[in-house]
Structure formats: C-alpha cells, structure tokens
C-alpha cells in the first residue's frame, strides 16, 4: 500500500476521498482508478503515465460510499469522467485489469478529438 501512495505522489496522481472527489472530477477529463489495499498486486501500473487528463485513485476500503455510489463491484476498476460525468468504464476480470497504457491513452485522446470536432 505504501508503494501505491508513493508512486501516486511522485507522478501527480491525486488520492481521492469522499471529501474531495466531486471537486476533483468536476472539470475536464479525469481518470480514476478504484483499488483496494488487499489487491495492490493488480493496480494498473501504466495508469501513472497517462497524458492530457487529471489522474486520481480511490481506495474503496477507506471510501465505501464512493464504491457504492459508483457501483464498483471489482477492483481495479477505471472510470473516465468528463466534467463530472462518467463516459467510459474498464473493470477487472478476476482481480486483474488487462489493458495497456496505449489503450488507456486512446480513450482519452478519442474523447479530446470528439470535443475538438464540436
């Protein structure tokens, strides 16, 4: 768990809680990883290198209300928000989320492209 917190601090990932969640996701594209201290082996390591989005993590063990509100059934789960609204969700399969940094970045880039075309 300490490794998760240290990597988050070093790479600009905001630790999200009930107190700051709404404020942190209300503007722009925000990518949030929901994780649990009992499953740190499968946190999404490529998550911290994403560009053009704000990054946040929610420890569901400490923020059960956010887990319930966002209907998190398995960790890790990654939710992409834009201006406070969910637009994409990726959920783990048997506690492991199989994705690449390129796939994650493409979701962000595609959304930015759609916004530019408006």
Question: Residue spans of the language-model regions?
Answer:
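Short gly/ser/thr-rich secondary-structure transition/capping motifs
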Residues: 13-17, 58-60
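Active-site-proximal beta-strand/loop segments in catalytic clefts of secreted hydrolases
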Residues: 34-36, 58-61, 93
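Mature extracytoplasmic domains of secretory-pathway proteins
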Residues: 45-71
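Structural micro-motif
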Residues: 69-82
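Non-catalytic, surface beta->alpha helical segment in thiol-disulfide oxidoreductase systems
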Residues: 80-118
